[in-house]
Amino acid sequence: MSNRKLFTPWSLKGVTLKNRIVMSPMCMYSSHEKDGKVQPFHMTHYISRAVGQVGLIMVEATAVTPQGRISDQDLGIWDDAHIDGLAALTSQIKTYGSKTAIQLAHAGRKAEVEGTIYGPSAIPFDENSRTPVEMTKEDIKETVQAFKKGAERAKAAGFDIIEIHGAHGYLINEFLSPLSNKREDEYGGSPENRYRLLREVIDAVKEVWAGPLFVRVSASDYKTKGLDVADYVGFAKWMKEQGVDLIDVSSGAVVPADINVFPGYQVGFADTIRAQAEIQTGAVGLITSGLQAEEILQNGRADLIFVARELLRDPYWPKTAAKQLNTKIEGPVQYDRAW
């Protein structure tokens, strides 16, 4: 076993990851029949990273309603007909030693599908975007129940971990940010009110899900009068009280913004939330080397490393990272002669 922290196990609620590497959820827009079902591409895409020894494979943003899709070719979990394909996917991933997670999502005003799109307020993302319909309280209630049903289906499909997508300008993020939420009822105004939708979604999911629960957040709006990491420390404390186990810390995309991007540019947000809210965090964003990942973990800045585009470039990134750290990890027996 490697003595590098990146390759130490991580355990929670009966789920043990063999290492701290997470395949970050990345939309593939590959449900080409527009029915939200798993396709052969998804099987190849995710299973190849399991063969590559990723500890946790997180399936991309999966829509809890048809109108909550980012595109009409997104994966879906709004119908029982989606369960079989997702179950086949989780089963195959686990065959190769990885654990499985799914990100439950609703795109809100950033949905690019036919028909009505919804948001907390009738404010478009930008001048080139459609204007959403402001959600009624009944719309909100139905959406909360859609997340609950999505969690039930995720459980039926055999996922080990659920993540609620509260980042990147999608519906939950839109409710959290005062830049996109101008409501005057109990879902707008104060931080407590803007958090209410996420609170209700977490409570609903936990009614049917006892396993590890993550929430992805955008810890900065990168705009004056928008949210910053201090606001998310407060939200994270509330999430912890509700039983959320880990905050997956990203940033941006609730409104157009100029973002100074550099290697590990979001790690400081994960560090701050971890320290000040006393909750486990995942670091994500331009983490490309084993040395970089190991530094984050060794210095207690995050608990898990979410790797995105680097895993698109290199499905066997765990082996690459191990080599960079001058250590060895066990690989597939079929690859012994080259591993």
UniProtKB/Swiss-Prot annotation:
Keywords (A to Z) from UniProt: Detoxification, Flavoprotein, FMN, NADP, Oxidoreductase
Enzymatic reactions: A + NADPH + H(+) = AH2 + NADP(+)
Binding site for FMN: S24, P25, M26, C27, A61, Q103, R216, A308, R309
One annotated GO biological process: response to toxic substance
Binding site for substrate: Y29, H165, G166, A167, H168
Catalytic activity, EC: 1.6.99.1
SUPFAM superfamilies membership: FMN-linked oxidoreductases
GO molecular function: FMN binding; NADP binding; NADPH dehydrogenase activity
Needed co-factor(s): FMN
Signal peptide segment: none
Top-level taxon: Bacteria
A Pfam family the protein falls into: Oxidored_FMN
Matches recorded under InterPro entries: Aldolase_TIM (IPR013785), NADPH_DH_bac (IPR023663), OxRdtase_FMN_N (IPR001155), YqjM-like (IPR044152)
Disulfide bonds listed in the record: none
Family: Belongs to the NADH:flavin oxidoreductase/NADH oxidase family. NamA subfamily.
Function description: Catalyzes the reduction of the double bond of an array of alpha,beta-unsaturated aldehydes and ketones. It also reduces the nitro group of nitroester and nitroaromatic compounds. It could have a role in detoxification processes.
Self-association and partners: Homotetramer.
Protein name: NADPH dehydrogenase
Species annotation: Bacillus licheniformis (strain ATCC 14580 / DSM 13 / JCM 2505 / CCUG 7422 / NBRC 12200 / NCIMB 9375 / NCTC 10341 / NRRL NRS-1264 / Gibson 46)
